[in-house]
Amino acid sequence: MQTLTIIRPDDMHLHLRDGDALKAVAPYTARQMGRAVIMPNLKPPVVSVADALAYKARIMAALPEGSAFEPLMTLYLTDQATPELVREAKAAGIVAFKLYPAGATTNSDSGVTDLFKLIPVLEEMAKQGILFLVHGEVTDPEIDIFDREAAFIGRVMKPVLAQVPNLKVVFEHITTAEAARLVLEAGDNVAASVTPQHLLLNRNDLLVGGVRPHHFCLPVLKRETHRQALVAAVTGEKAHKFFLGTDSAPHAKSAKENACGCAGMFSAMTAIELYAEVFEKAGALDKLEAFASENGARFYGIPENADTITLVKQSQTVPASVPYGDGELVPMRAGGEIGWTVQY
């Protein structure tokens, strides 16, 4: 039987929620991943060092006994952010600030309205070596939802990189050929996280044969040509600039199967197996370890995990749903098969 042993991976983009939801989902990530970069878009958002440290304590309390999993904490960038906050964050071990353009995604109401007014804050991030994590979509209602990432590149990303050229930027959950091209052409201070859904699915999987709410995420799934461009990027000559970030974003089944369903796919349960499928299909299984376990750690300036995990070429059936507080949660590929299984 084919096996693949790799350095334990890290999830560089994860939503863990809070309260009972946190307790339900944290163990799935802790089983596979050594660390995860925790998104700060709670209600209310994680905007201060005190908020982040309190949230980290709640995450640690939700982990299974004996777990070595480490949450890497971030702050939610707001219009009120200051260079002093950046210095405080650095001193407290916060790894990054996250940009949510106001209204772009789940719990982004407190997001930034004009990033260019925060240039002194970004300059302090560059000085302190704190990363800038970007949800790269414009929110202009005149821009089609399928074009919002591409529009962001010209309107925001390129001008910011020109003004703060040494800022370390992660273009999060990229979905387009344009975003991949930007990262490939930019300096070594720019990298990207890529989700399993944007490597495996296209917008037909969302809309053909009926609306499939469990495939609805933001940024929304794109054309097949964009999916192919992402696979080419994560397996190509400059693959070191791309890394694993699931954007696993749990919402109760009732909130997804809804007249106004929530955006987000829950992939944490079988994340590394889904990525293994991507790399296997691309004939690049030998590049999975770098993508999952090395590139993100190197970009964040942290050592790789010291232990390993082993994947077995053995099919598994993903549960139709799992418990989630008082409700249930539908995982990515619910009821379907994945050709790989982690040996626990």
From Swiss-Prot:
SUPFAM superfamilies (alphabetical)? Metallo-dependent hydrolases
UniProt keyword Cell cycle, yes or no: no
The cofactor required is: Zn(2+)
Q: What is its EC number?
A: 3.5.2.3
Keywords from the UniProt entry: Hydrolase, Metal-binding, Pyrimidine biosynthesis, Zinc
Binding positions for substrate per the UniProt entry: 15-17, 41, 135, 218, 251, 263
Cofactor note as given = Binds 2 Zn(2+) ions per subunit.
Report residues binding Zn(2+) 1.
13, 15, 98, 247
Q: Which InterPro entries match?
A: Amidohydro-rel (IPR006680), DHOdimr (IPR004721), Dihydroorotase_CS (IPR002195), Metal_Hydrolase (IPR032466)
Cite a single GO BP annotation: 'de novo' pyrimidine nucleobase biosynthetic process
Q: Name one Pfam family in it.
A: Amidohydro_1
The reaction(s) this protein catalyses: (S)-dihydroorotate + H2O = N-carbamoyl-L-aspartate + H(+)
What's the protein here called? Dihydroorotase
User: Corresponding gene?
Assistant: pyrC
